[in-house]
């Protein structure tokens, strides 16, 4: 009897131990599955920057390289100019983006400078002999010229020399950002060190008012600048077309249109009536 009791007790202990092992194994498997599920959930790829941005006639191909990081990037690139594989390495996409910013700034200055003499002349703020349409100031010699202190050819050579020097310095900074702050330049080199981004050098010379003090405001200002720059480039193109078609300046065109919209508009100027 004692022997049977010992055997029974041993069997019960063995069964209990087996049960604990089975239950423990299942619990361990369950925990492992849950843990592996959590790991898989955490490995979800992040959302691309600018994924929810506004798009203008974007294609699947353009969105493969225009990811919204550049200011004013709406995925619009019908000619594939910014495609790093479409140019065969001949044109660097970063250079195109940089060039758009620079040309936009020149266009904004040009658009304002071309129309300002007309407006100031009409308002009587400057003499009439200097209130000329932009194409009569010497930029297009056959259309007329103003009597400056030197002839047009001398002025052209001088402008080319000055602009060539400025553009050379700008290209040096593009090739090696910050290099202009290391070269002597009339004591101004401290303000030419830049920010590391050639398109937005900042500093006391290029951002004296300290705009864009935080990342959010800087991003908004970059977007506004590129939009206005693109508009200004279109305006300059419009100035050229107006000059060829109407023979008067943009401000005079506006006054003529407001005075008689029916007979002075795009269609009548192009003889589509």
Swiss-Prot record:
Q: Where does chlorophyll a 6 bind?
A: 257
Amino acids binding chlorophyll a 3 = 225
Record has Nuclease as a keyword: no
Entry cofactor note text?
Binds at least 14 chlorophylls (8 Chl-a and 6 Chl-b) and carotenoids such as lutein and neoxanthin.
- The positions annotated for binding chlorophyll b 2 are 105, 140
Subcellular location field: Plastid, Chloroplast thylakoid membrane
Q: What is the lineage of its organism?
A: Eukaryota, Viridiplantae, Streptophyta, Embryophyta, Tracheophyta
- Organism of origin is Solanum lycopersicum (Tomato)
The protein's UniProt keywords, in alphabetical order, are: Acetylation, Chlorophyll, Chloroplast, Chromophore, Magnesium, Membrane, Metal-binding, Phosphoprotein, Photosynthesis, Photosystem I, Photosystem II, Plastid, Thylakoid, Transit peptide, Transmembrane, Transmembrane helix
**Name of the protein:** Chlorophyll a-b binding protein 8, chloroplastic
Membrane-protein topology? Multi-pass membrane protein
């Amino acid at each position: 009897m004692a022997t049977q009791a010992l055997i029974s007790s041993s069997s019960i202990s063995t069964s209990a131990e087996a049960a604990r092992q089975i239950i423990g194994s299942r619990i361990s498997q369950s925990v492992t599955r849950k843990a592996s599920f959590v790991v898989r959930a955490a490995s979800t790829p992040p959302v691309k920057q600018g994924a929810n941005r506004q798009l203008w006639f974007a294609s699947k191909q353009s969105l493969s390289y225009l990811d919204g990081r550049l200011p004013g990037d709406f995925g619009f690139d019908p000619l594939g100019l910014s495609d790093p594989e479409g140019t065969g390495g001949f044109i660097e996409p970063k250079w195109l983006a940089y060039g758009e910013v620079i040309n936009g700034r020149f266009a904004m200055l040009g658009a304002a400078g071309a129309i300002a003499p007309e407006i100031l002349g009409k308002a009587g703020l400057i003499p009439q002999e200097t209130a000329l349409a932009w194409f009569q100031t010497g930029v297009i010699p056959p259309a007329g010229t103003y009597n400056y202190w030197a002839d047009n050819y001398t002025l052209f050579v001088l402008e080319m020399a000055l602009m060539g020097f400025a553009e050379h310095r700008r290209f040096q900074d593009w090739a090696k950002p910050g290099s202009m702050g290391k070269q002597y330049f009339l004591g101004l080199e401290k303000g030419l060190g830049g920010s590391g981004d050639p398109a937005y050098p900042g500093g006391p010379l290029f951002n004296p008012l300290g705009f864009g003090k935080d990342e959010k405001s800087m991003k908004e200002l970059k977007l506004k600048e590129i939009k206005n720059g693109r508009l200004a480039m279109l305006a300059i193109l419009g100035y050229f077309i107006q000059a060829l078609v109407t023979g008067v300046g943009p401000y005079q065109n506006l006054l003529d249109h407001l005075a008689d919209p029916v007979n002075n508009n795009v269609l009548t100027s192009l003889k589509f009536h």
